[in-house]
Every structure is written in C-alpha cells, then in structure tokens.
C-alpha cells in the first residue's frame, strides 16, 4: 500500500484553467441545493450526486444499485457512481464563467501583484476591473499610449477621431487578462535589471519590487494571465454542508450562499449575452459577477461585505483559513481528541512520584476498549457487543479486569495553560474512589497547580509506541529539573518545608540534652517515649551509620546532633554526608569536625561550645535535591523526594503550627518612628512653600521619607522577632509569606498606588493587626484593583509573546553532532553598571570550549578545546581568575535549519549532553515565554527630575527587544573607535555635543541636555558604545558593528530584564531566539549570481549561491545582515505553511502561490498541519527506519546509559 503521508515536500501554485477542469467532476449550472420535499440534492445544483458522488455509501441516487458488490458502477438511470459517500469530501465541481473575473487576492493584496506585473497603479486597475474606465490594449497606429485609461466619454471621442477599429480598448477583467497575456516576462526582466544599474531612490525601490514579482512568475512557471479566472472551482459539498436542524429548518454554510450568488449572476449574464442585450446592461451584470466572485473568495476585502440574515457578514473562503477559528489554527494545529477526560484535582499525598489517582468511573470509560478486549479474551463474553453490554451494566467482574488493564499503562495529565513542556506529564494511574483526579503534591509547581478548584485533563496514549514514549520520556518522576535553568522544579513547598524546618530546629536545654545513643532506633525510642525532645542536642555513635562518607578521623567517634536531624538524615541517600549545617560546605565536603567528641571528652562541654544552628529552609532543601540529582540522577532523586515529602507532612502535622492574632507582635517604638516621619514631611512641605524646592523634588522627598519609615519599622520587627513565633517560622522557612506580608500585619502598610499608577503621598499608617480606618481601606482598594487588572492583561500579553517565540523557533532542532565551525563566542560575566547580572560561572556551565583555557598565572591548561565544561570545571576556571572564555555558541553554529550538539551544550532538563532530535527551539521559546507572567507590566518612572526618559522594563521591554523595535529612551552611540576629547554644553539649543577622536577622523554627536552621560573626557570608546544612559537601538548597532556584537547585546539585555525580576533563564535559550532574528541577509549587489538586488534571503542560501560563483571564478554577491523582529521573522520563514498558520494568512499564501513555493517540511508546525510525525525526537528520519538486529548479534554491556529515544525506536520497530 502506498503511504499517502510519505511525501518530501508540498508546493503551492496558481491553478491554470486546465488544472481546474482536471479537478472537476462536472459543471454546477443551477443555484439549487436540495429539494425541500424529498430532501435529495437537485440535479446540476450545488449538491448534485452525479458530480460530487452519492450521499449514502454504496448506493446510487435512485436506489437501483445498493450494496458494495456494485462498487464502481455508474447507474444507467440516475448517472450516480456507486462508491463511498466520503468522496463528497474530495470531489470538486466547477462553474464556467461567462466573463473573465479577476482574483481579488492578486489585485487587492499589498503590494498589488497584478499592478506590479502590469506596471499600473491599483487605482487604475480598480477602475478598469469594475467597469469605470477603458484601458488601451493595442493602440495600433494611433498616438494613444498602451495601458492608458479612457473614460466612457473619452473613448467615444477617440473612436470618432480615429475611426472604428483603429485601436483596441476594453474594460473589465477581460481587458486586464488581455494585457497580462501580452506581458513578455524575459524582456521586462532584462529591461528592469538594466534600469537597476543606474536607478536610485523611489524609482529603484519600485523597480526592485516589480523585478521580484516578474522573476517569481518567470521561475515558477505560473502564467500572469492565470490571476484572472475564466473558470471557478466549486469545493466539495461536505466541506460546505447543509444540516437539518430539529424543527425542519436547515443550517447551511455561508459558502453555499456565496456560490449561489455567483451562479445566479453567471446564468443571468449568459441569458443577457444570448439576447444581445444593450452593452450597459451586460456591463452591469459583469460587474455584479465580479463582485460576487470577490465576495466568495474574500468577503469584505473590497467595499461593504455581503451580509446574511441579521446583517452578519458571510464567511468567505479566506475567512475559513484566517485567525484563531480558521482552518489552520482550529483544526490543523490542534484537534480535539478522544480517550480524554477532565475533572477537578485533589491532593494525593500518599502517591509515589510517578503515580496519579484516577476515579474508577473515569478509568472504565477511558480504558473501555482495552477492558472489552480482555473480557472477550477471558471468555466472560462471547463477542465485543456482549462485552460492551457487560461494561455498561457495571458487572462486578469488570473492576478486576480494569486493574489489570491499567497496570503499566501510563496516562498523560495536562493543565491549561500549558506554558512549558512540564504542563503535560505522564503518570501511572491508580484507581481511587470519588470523582476528582489525585495529583502528587510535588508536581504542582511544574503545572503551577493548586487545589482550590483547578481542573486537569487526562489523555490515554493508545499505541505501543505512544505508551513507550510516555513512560520513557514523559514520566513525571523523570522531570526533576526545569528546562529553563536546569534547577530542580520539584522542590517541596508549604507544609513539607515547614515540617522539615521544624524537624531540623535546635534548642538549648530541652529534655534529653546530652544523652548518647548507640543508633537511630534507640534515639527514636527515647523521643517516642518522651525522654528526648526532637530539638535536643544529643550524641550518636558514628559507627551506627557505616555507609555515610565519614572522614577517617571521624569514624568510631560520638557525634553531636539532634533527634530531628537523625530522622532527617535517615531519609537522605546513603552517599550524601551527614547534614548538620544548612550550607553547601557540609553538603559537598562533609560533616565539620567540631561536632565529634574526642575520646574522654564530656558531651555537655562540646554542646555548650557549639552555636545553635539555624534549621533547613526551602532553599537548602533545593540545594540538597540538586546535589542528589547531580550525583545519583533521576531514580534515586525521585525516591528521595517522596521520602522528603512524607517526612515533611508528618512533622508539620505533629508540630501543629497555627496562627492567631496574638502571634502578630506589637512594635514598641512604632509611634516614635511615625512621629519623626510626620515631622520630616512637615519640614519638606515648609521648604517647598518657601520655594526652596520644586514640586517634583518635594514629591520624591515625601515618598522617600515614608518609605524609610516603613523600612525602619521592618528592621525593628526583624530585630525583635521571636524565632519560635509560628508566623516567623513560616516566613523564615520559605513555606509561605515574606517579610513584606509580615510587616503589613505588624508594622505599617505604607504607600499605595493611585489608580493612575502614581504613588500617593498619604501612606497607610495602620497595620492589619490594628485595623485600617475607612479612608485607609478606600485607598488600599485602588492598588488591589490595579493588581488584578494588570495580572489579567499581563497573562494575555505573555501568552501572545510565547506564541510568537514558538513560531519563530519551532524548526530549530538539534540536527547533527558537530558542525565543525571555527568560530566561537567570547563570554564574560554580564554586568549592569556595578552589579553582576549573571556570573561567568553560571554562563560557562554545560557549554563546550572553543579554545583551550589556560591558568592566567601559571599558564597550565585547565581544559582543552571542544571539551564540555562541567559545574566543577566552571568553578575551577573562575577560581583561577580567568575573566573571559571563548565557548561554542548557538550564535556561531554552522548547522543549517538547526543547531549542532557541541554549539548547544547540555540539555538543561536532563543535565546530560543534548541528543540529536531535541526540539531546542520550542524549549527555548517556552523557557522565555513561561516566566513572562512574572514580569511587571509597567514602565518605571525613575522618579522626579533625574529621569530624562522612562526606561522600559519588564514584559514591554522583552517585547521591544524581540520585536527589534526602536527602544524608548534610546542611547546615543558612537560610530568611531577612539577617545572622547570634548563634551561641550550649548545652552541656547539645550544640547550637549560630544566629540570622539578616532584614527579615521572626528565624530560629533548631539545629545539632549537632560541625558545622563555614560562617558567622560578622556574615556576610550569602542565603535557602537553608548555615550548616554538608555537602551541601544539594535538595528543601529548592526550598521555600526557586526552581527555578533548585536547578538551579544540582545542576549545581555534579555538577561538583565529577567534577572532583575529574579527569574533565571539559561543563556542558550535566549541565544536560540536571537539567532533566529538574524538569519536573513539583504542582497546589495548580485555580482555574477542570478540573485535579485534587495532580496531578503537565508544566510545559508546566500552562501550557497556564492559558493558556485566563487569556484567558477566569478564575482560573488554582496549582502548586508538584517535584524528582524520575531513576528517578521516568522512570516519570512521558508515554510509557507508555517507562516500562513501564524498571521496574515492570505498575504502569505498569495505570495507563495505566485512564487510556486515548495515547503520542504523541515519544521514541526508544517508536519503537524499535514498530519505527519514531527521531525524531532523519535520522529527524526535517523530514528525511524531502523533495521532491528537479532538479539544474539547485540553485545550486552552492563551499566551503559541508553538514551530513551534509542530504546523506544528499537521497541517501535
């Protein structure tokens, strides 16, 4: 059998009239749809069975031939072929138009393709097509210009002047068709190329545009006259169905109405032509036909849209494709699936990390086919029908079978919005009572789920391959690290943190202090019987824990610890050191010696000499998990996480921490602090009234005063807090709340934002314990409302940003092992002024070196070229005092349509080298988009006079960077490398002038008077350096410097925004996105190549075009790099399917059709649209057609890491 989906590429072209006829199964001549009495399709109508096929399987219209045995026979009575009814989704008809009609996409689009081909303005075209003017087609011997327009009156005058038949002029689409037929593509192209050599300015731009379109026609084999239709295809009837509603009425697709209008007008025109009606009547009918076809193809593109009942515009063919509800985004990129369900989620604290609880009723419905198969196999029922009845009856025996069926059959759980790949994970189902899905508490963070009524969807993978993938690649227990930064995403939260915090507290003088136990069991027994407290410091024999990595001098001794810490260390992986202190030294280097008793030493003496340790907080638990993962990988880590969870829940229950109003302390000197602030504000206002400061200065001073007062209260609160206060414990452990919540409960609420976003000068002096006055309450509602609306707007903005990012990078896949490039990226720590945004150590981890790294003092080679830098290696490099390293980077990768493994480095989600087939583009887009909601919306005011411009931050700044827009608050940059020799202020024009002396000459830059300078006289500056504060315009930087410096700048800018909000994102994700913005070049001079000047093309295509020319000794083309925003880059992608499904569908398809574009289906989106397996992961060609070997040929090696993909592919075969 031929697999219809195994094709290499897909092409779109203009349809020639002969092509349309070859598709068609007959002409639709009548506007009728179905007979309202018999409900059968009318002959020669829009639903005719003769043309489109039978409405019932294997049955002709009159009923003479029924059953499959007559397959392929055409009925002699009704003329209907006996076949499947499904052909009504495939067979097309056609309408023979009695007058040519222009296709609105090619005449109306921007730029008008018809206009460019004919070198006529769109307005002139419109006048001709809609019968407002004549156009001269052939002037013969008259002095008329070809393509010139004549009004009705001028036409008559010219006819009288030159005589009938002395020239040819027509109106309507036929005139345009005649002109298009006369276009000599080769001659026009040669002429334009000649003109381009001398032209400049507007004239050149126009010539380049025309050349582009004419060249497209020339190369694609499309004929320009096909932009005018003589024959109209009719799409299959099942794609524009009529459905009977209850009540006898019909709901029909709008397309039927639009087709009916076309047929009616076409038939009327045919009759008028037969009757030889007067020209003006025929003309009017032709114009109406043109409008009817326009409405069918794209209703509302020209003039008022045609409306149906209730003045609703009808949905035309174009609208069927466009937008979120269009064919692309609604049905092709995402479909509804069966074997799925959704329900509210509840917590499942007893589940293992790879399990989820599925309600019985839900499971029986989801796994019905599997259960039925088993029933038949066990011979409880004779056939599938009986088995189905058994399941529906709820027979007792089905539950045991269900248990068997779901064993080892993973299911997928998804929570909307799915912001990153951790939004869908696989679990093994466990049957439970009730109606809610049970979710493991640790995976909540990845899903961003909580149990206040969230719902989740469940899906069943059906095929063996799908099950294998779910189990090997998507199991929740495997997803411990977050792909965006490589940090653990499954850290314990809330109660689990609190329990472990309480467990690891230490306290002096509690019962049992100084007791010595032989092992853990004895200590636990003492604690259970009330002889020792959880927090008491006691001794334990080191030898009772022989597997721990003790130092030699620590063995056979007694160690001081607490009962709680004995329990805490009991759940740790054996090879981790015994944890006494919540710091990295203890975790990586081992337990400090001070906790061990020397022989004969008194334990109480040692205890008294030790400081009381702080307990383990959320951050410390995160570090322990990361270390565990680094050493033992997933299996051990997920088991450890489950133990940590159980211990945390158990002890937070025992601790029984609660919050009462008495737990909120009263600050003793609150009144003094507030009085002092009032006094200071009064002084400021007095100074303002005397005219000693401006209103802006006064506002800043007042708000600063209140802010300082609030901070003073906060400081006092921290100084006086009791570490055993439950609120303090919750806050300190990181379980819930932070110091700002605490200070609003106990200190003062402070300054509030007014509805316009400006901070009000009147602070709220009360705190929640004292209670707010009515006025204070009213003030605080402004901020609360603003917070809610901001969040709602931000979510939509952030979602749209993610969609654009995914679209631009979806075809970036790891394609090969090593691209062999000789370029690299020199990196150092990213700084913002004096602050370090991202350290060199962070940037080095998990990357490959480009050159070897040497110790700056000793010259010893720390690491060779093209080696992977591990976490420890990165620390070693930084400790040696190295400040910059050249690494392999996505920016400089030479792989086409993707990235190679060495330029990418490790996969942050697994901590191992990335595998070929990983869809790194999508992961990068999700990693940047997912934290988008955490970024702020507002544009900050830097306060008062000092600000020259508002610096954009947060989400708007990220959008500004990725869309390559000109930034707000733009910095002035220098184009000269040299020294700043002078900065002169010109008071009359309120500007400053900066002079930079370079080798090639002096650069003079005018800077606004208020701008804050970044340079001083005598400073050395590089090309592209900013002279003033603010953001550099990247397009400008690209003109002054090279591509790499723009990429480096954009990377640093994105990181600044995210890091300032406390969000960490791996550099490589930003690199992938930024690289996609710089994939194109614009051809400046084509040299000896056949490229067109001004064309935008992919860097790799441009290099290819030049390669052949250089080899044959010709002059290569020159080009200039182009920086594109992500939206523009998505639309300029080589795949027209991907671009059309993103935005501006009609424009993309119009352009692709004229060029006869081929889509080679390299990206993920294109393959999803046509229903092929995506070319990433196990779907890559190299993993698919694998020949299985016999088992005895394969060498079996113990303890080898096998990639999940390899395992799966072998199973799939």
Curated annotation (Swiss-Prot):
Binds 1 Mg(2+) ion per subunit. Binds 2 Zn(2+) ions per subunit. Its EC number is 2.7.7.6. GO terms for molecular function: DNA binding; DNA-directed RNA polymerase activity; magnesium ion binding; zinc ion binding. Zn(2+) 2 binds at residues 819, 893, 900, 903. Disulfide bonds: none annotated. Keywords: DNA-directed RNA polymerase, Magnesium, Metal-binding, Nucleotidyltransferase, Transcription, Transferase, Zinc. The keyword Iron does not apply. It catalyses: RNA(n) + a ribonucleoside 5'-triphosphate = RNA(n+1) + diphosphate. Zn(2+) 1 binds at residues 60, 62, 75, 78. Mg(2+) binds at residues 450, 452, 454. Pfam families: RNA_pol_Rpb1_1, RNA_pol_Rpb1_2, RNA_pol_Rpb1_3, RNA_pol_Rpb1_4, RNA_pol_Rpb1_5. The RNAP catalytic core consists of 2 alpha, 1 beta, 1 beta' and 1 omega subunit. When a sigma factor is associated with the core the holoenzyme is formed, which can initiate transcription. DNA-dependent RNA polymerase catalyzes the transcription of DNA into RNA using the four ribonucleoside triphosphates as substrates. Belongs to the RNA polymerase beta' chain family. PANTHER family: DNA-DIRECTED RNA POLYMERASE, DNA-DIRECTED RNA POLYMERASE SUBUNIT BETA. This is DNA-directed RNA polymerase subunit beta'. The gene is rpoC.
